[in-house]
Regions:
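Compositionally biased regions
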Residues: 6, 17, 29, 33, ...
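Short intrinsically disordered terminal tails
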Residues: 1-5, 94, 98-102
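Acidic, low-complexity, intrinsically disordered interaction modules
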Residues: 30-92
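Intrinsic disorder/low-complexity segments
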Residues: 16, 25, 51, 64, ...
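Short terminal alpha-helical segments
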Residues: 3-28
Length: 102
């Protein structure tokens, strides 16, 4: 999908609350057992992989900005879209994208 407006609309519509599960991680360079200890760069790789699957878009620029292992929180950007990976109340990692940079 090359239409930026269409991509932004998709991100706003279905970009929040994506649980990172085995199916979503399939083919990702970061494996499931590495998620709890990943650094910001690895979080960006996970976000870019998931972004590509969810939105049928090849990510060209990714950047991990912050990680807080104690809080279970990682942030960064993929192709100008902000991302946040957070641990929810039941222990799942949830990926949220936003149309504005994190």
């Amino acid at each position: 999908m090359n239409d930026l407006a269409g991509l932004q609309a998709l991100v706003e519509d279905v970009g929040s609350g994506n649980v990172i599960d085995a199916e979503l991680l399939d083919g990702c360079p970061v494996e499931a057992h590495e998620l709890d200890e990943m650094d910001a760069s690895q979080a960006a790789q996970v976000a870019a992989h998931c972004f590509g699957l969810l939105f049928d878009h090849k990510v060209e620029q990714l950047q991990g900005l912050e990680e807080d292992l104690d809080a279970g929180l990682w942030t960064g950007t993929v192709d100008g879209f902000g991302f946040q990976i957070r641990r929810d109340d039941v222990g799942d990692l949830v990926l949220d994208f936003s149309s504005q940079q994190a």
